[in-house]
Amino acid sequence: VSTVHTRRITGLETEFGITSVLDSHRRLGPDEVARYLFAPVVDRYRSSNIYWRNGSRVYLDVGAHPEYATAECDSLHQLVAYDRSGEVIFHRLAEQCERTLAERGIGGKVYLLKNNTDSLGNSYGCHENFLVSRDVPLKALSAQLLPFLVTRQLICGAGKISVPSPGAPNENFGPGFCLSQRSDHVWEGVSSATTRSRPIINTRDEPHADSARYRRLHVIVGDSNMSETTTALKVGSALLVLEMIEAGVELPDFELSNEIRSIREISRDFSGSTPLDLRNGGTVTALAIQQAFHAAAVDWLDQRGEDGTGTPNSQLADVVDLWGRVLDCFGTGDFSPVDTEIDWVIKKSLIDAVAERGNLGITDPRLAQIDLTYHDINPDRGLFHLLVRRGRAKTLIDPAEILAATEQAPATTRAAVRGKFLHAAEESTRQTTVDWTRLKVNGEGGGELLLPDPFCTGSPEIDAALADLTDLLAEAPA
């Protein structure tokens, strides 16, 4: 029997879109803008791939995409706070980038977008990481999880206007609003590649933990969410499903015969009623799949144990409540009860209102502009942030908590040790090497500390070894 993890290590990786609009005739490609964005990081750390003071990773991914990977978190609201802190960190870098460009006589604006597709049809991701027990075979885990992941865009998609282009995955669909940004950009269910085939679940096994006990489930099908309540629903519902799978809860067999065709069709159906073919014969709707998982989660929450660690039942009760309310809206066709809490609904309400007022068709560039500006992480400029200020989009996390999360690592996971080391390293002239499981002071008379357990915030041995490393950092390099 598997262990049920009500305290589970989770993390979110977000790739941001980057673009600039310059005052001069000069144009900067995304690569150049990204280099300017990361210049202060490279100046200070001699690398564009670093760990930030808060234990999270800040780096420039392939294809000029700035990326933020949260430190290890072990509860839901903590994860949402650290995800949001990444936006704040990158917004500050963008402001600095604009100042640098102005000093060089290249005035203009730098835009960082927390979305998943650009105007050229490229896609970039929001990847969710969950530590899961090896007691559950991957095949069984995937079989139960895939139908949930394919259909959960109903409840947590970010929404987008899809305009078909030749050779693109959407070429056979007419223009229109979609529930999900990523649904047109995944090509298979389970795979070990991330970019070439872009699966729903990635199986490349680097658990960053004891590989005999754990595997890291890497989910790459999700949309990046602006809404904190939608992020909490996306991750919280997945946490509940994983707990139920580990507990051996009898979940219905919804193995789909073609996940990829299904995911694209679901994205264009606001009733959730498109029939999907099942592998064992018969059909089922996306709404019915989500309703079954939701009903199971309601029952599970009634018996879910608590020990004061991990995600409390109160946070998951809010998740289950919102989950149910969104599904009820699919039944009635009226989404106004959740139009401040779910990204795709918030965005669609805005686009519909502007389109109606100006009598605009769905392919009008003014609507495309709204679609993009919704995801601008600049709090003074981004449409989502404007809606928050106007009371038209809910928040979950105290802004002070988000700001604190830009400086301090999560106190309840291994990241706490990394955070202490990183703060000491900031004051030091010595070179260091840091990754998820290792802290190292380089050079002669250096030292290293291995941290294989992501749940461990310290021990007498770790604390002593960290103190030794901190002492080394206080010395001048040999």
What are these regions (language model features)?
Residues V1-L113, L145-G157, G189-I201, E206-A478:
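Terminal catalytic/cofactor-binding subdomain
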Residues G108-S192:
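Internal, well-ordered domain-core segments that constitute the primary functional module
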